[in-house]
């Protein structure tokens, strides 16, 4: 597997001279980016460009990612880390914990400064004109994207139209602009960028994978408009009727506007057309050509497991992925999601067994018939936690002859691709020398090292449990719910007891499935249910599920649910939660749908991980970790108090 990107490696190195301690509201230029050495030649231009990307938040840095492990999808054994302040509700204006406010405005300033230098004749000797125009378009994209990230956090924001004037008086500092004006500005930036960017970066540009494209610009415009149409931002007078600037101007739209859904739908259709014309398609069974681990064997499960880990150099786009439109190709590092998710290595290190899906999330995944477990009339929901012996008919789901809960059987392929459960499988290779799992009697490794998987046992004393017995329970590196995450862990990884092995897969920021489901959501809200189901079913089909209308008519307790606006809305939302599990969506989607208070303000539930037998283990219990969400305050992020104090024109987010 070819791991990219050299561009982002350079980006991180180049960013070192730009991440200064001053903030945007101080309007102080970064002195270290001035001087002829920064504008002398083509390499200087490339370094400057990469420095502009250096302000992208790291989406998969577990300890410090705002939206990664902070929804209700998982609970972890790492609640001492910085991110845990958010699900616990322990953040405020005086202590925002993780804040984008200053960093992203620094990034915006850096982009405008680079644009200014690109527009000066004589700068960057040897830089071809086509590259100069491409760089201009890329930083225009980043200006739009950084404003988008800010608006997602804070709603109405300060709009930056040009390089800030270092001589600006505090009395002339800007305040926030009305939210709809912010949306228009961001969309204009994406439109402008799309005109100057290539649709893909392939062939000789393969080392540029991760840089902006016109398809990414169109996709991000659609995403911005989706947020603008959503309940949090569209006519939410209950929360924001008093959200006004210092002059009394209303900052949030207080009247619902259904046409915003139509506008977003048009943008999604434009992005989909551009993406498909550029060759993007949903990663499916025919794309899964990796020749290493033979597990998972089921073709649907296998394709889903590799959907966001296969960036094989065998692809037509070297190092690319047929579905991922834009990715962050910085590596996650030793303390990333892979090592934190992998089954525990007794007598070793680097596999910490600690990213645990919650029962709330696990219950969202469908049955094999493509319905929620409480809506499928063929699923024994009332007795779902009963332990049963696995028979040969379910051998691809769990190990025959051993026991698991009914809850884990007859589920959809995504469940088996991304979740490990009692006596189910964790597909991972064990290194030929000093192998991580080779000595475990529950591990299968063929003689040619091509098929490797672990049978997971979470009952106390088992290989994935909290400890070997009741007297040696670990206080870290354990699953708090009795389940483990498999998403983003490459089955081809050959793990040794030293635990240093992990793959630096690019991280999807937006992929084609998100365009299909975003379009379906917008169409459903405008009443076009037929086409909404059409695009919803594209994602369901790839997941190995029947069409939504067929599934409900044949297996649903409410056979007509997929034919009503309210029913289809609920179905599409659930589909997003399943498809984008652990992809930085849950934290924001629950907010924009105004559902965060319902789902983020409840105790996490899991199985009895202190049990010493399967019957006791099958009891559902509350996990000890605190969860708190205060409405309406926590729907948006707080602006740091220090910045409010520096700029008298900025008003604080309501509630903080």
Give the location of each predicted region:
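Membrane-proximal, proline-rich intrinsically disordered regions
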Residues: 22-70, 406-409, 640-656
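Conserved, well-structured interaction surfaces
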Residues: 41-59, 79-155, 168-209, 214, ...
């Amino acid at each position: 597997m070819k791991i990219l990107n050299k561009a982002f490696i350079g980006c991180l190195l180049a960013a070192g001279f730009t991440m200064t301690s001053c903030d945007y509201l101080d309007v102080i230029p970064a002195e270290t980016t001035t001087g002829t050495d920064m504008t002398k030649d083509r390499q200087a231009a490339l370094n400057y460009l990469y420095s502009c990307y250096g302000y992208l938040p790291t989406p998969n840095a577990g300890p410090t990612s705002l939206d990664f492990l902070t929804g209700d999808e998982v609970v972890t054994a790492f609640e001492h880390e910085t991110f845990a302040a958010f699900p616990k509700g322990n953040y405020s204006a005086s202590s925002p914990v993780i804040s984008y406010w200053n960093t992203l405005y620094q990034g915006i300033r850096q982009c405008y400064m680079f644009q200014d230098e690109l527009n000066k004749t004589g700068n960057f000797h040897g830089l071809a004109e086509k590259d100069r125009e491409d760089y201009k378009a890329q930083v225009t994209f980043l200006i739009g994207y950084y404003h988008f990230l800010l608006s997602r956090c804070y709603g109405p924001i300060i709009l930056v139209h040009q390089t800030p004037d270092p001589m600006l008086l505090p009395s002339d500092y800007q305040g926030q602009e009305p939210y709809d004006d912010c949306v228009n500005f961001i969309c204009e930036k994406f439109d402008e960028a799309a005109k100057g960017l290539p649709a893909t970066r392939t062939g000789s540009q393969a080392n540029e994978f991760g840089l902006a494209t016109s398809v990414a610009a169109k996709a991000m415009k659609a995403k911005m408009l989706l947020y603008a149409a959503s309940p949090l931002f569209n006519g939410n007078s209950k929360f924001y009727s008093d959200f006004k600037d210092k002059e009394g101007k209303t900052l949030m739209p207080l009247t619902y506007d259904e046409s915003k859904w139509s506008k977003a739908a048009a943008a999604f259709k434009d992005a989909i057309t551009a993406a498909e014309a550029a060759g993007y398609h949903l990663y499916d069974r025919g794309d899964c050509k990796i020749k290493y681990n033979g597990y998972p064997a089921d073709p649907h499960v296998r394709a889903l497991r590799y959907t966001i880990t296969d960036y094989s150099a065998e692809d037509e786009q070297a190092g690319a992925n047929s579905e991922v439109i834009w990715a962050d190709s910085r590596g996650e590092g030793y303390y990333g999601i892979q090592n934190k998710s992998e089954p525990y290595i007794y007598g070793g290190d680097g596999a910490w067994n600690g990213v645990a899906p919650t029962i709330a999330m696990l219950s969202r995944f469908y049955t094999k018939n493509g319905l929620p477990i409480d809506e499928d009339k063929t699923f024994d929901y009332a007795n779902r936690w009963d332990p049963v012996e696995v028979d040969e008919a379910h051998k691809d789901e769990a190990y025959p002859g051993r026991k698991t809960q009914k809850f884990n059987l007859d589920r959809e392929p995504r469940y088996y691709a991304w979740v490990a459960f009692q006596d189910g499988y964790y597909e991972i290779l064990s290194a030929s020398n000093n192998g991580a799992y080779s000595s475990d009697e529950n591990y299968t490794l063929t003689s040619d090292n091509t098929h490797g998987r672990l049978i997971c046992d979470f009952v106390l004393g088992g290989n994935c449990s909290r400890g070997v017995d009741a007297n040696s329970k670990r206080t870290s590196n354990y699953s708090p719910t009795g389940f483990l995450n498999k998403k983003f862990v490459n089955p081809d990884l050959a793990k040794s007891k030293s635990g240093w092995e992990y793959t630096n897969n690019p991280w999807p920021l937006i992929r084609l499935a998100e365009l299909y489901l975003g379009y379906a959501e917008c169409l459903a809200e405008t009443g076009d249910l037929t086409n909404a189901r059409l695009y919803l079913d594209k994602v369901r089909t790839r997941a190995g599920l029947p069409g939504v209308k067929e599934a409900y008519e044949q297996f649903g307790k409410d056979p007509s649910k997929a034919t009503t606006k309210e029913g289809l809305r609920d179905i599409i939302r659930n589909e997003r939660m399943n498809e984008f599990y652990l992809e930085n969506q849950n934290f924001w989607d629950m907010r924009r749908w105004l559902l965060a208070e319902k789902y983020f303000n409840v105790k996490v539930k899991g199985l009895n991980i202190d049990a010493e037998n399967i019957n006791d283990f099958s009891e559902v219990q509350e996990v000890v970790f605190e969860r708190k969400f205060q409405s309406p305050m926590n729907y948006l992020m707080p602006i740091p108090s220090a910045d409010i104090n520096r700029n008298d024109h900025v008003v604080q987010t309501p509630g903080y």
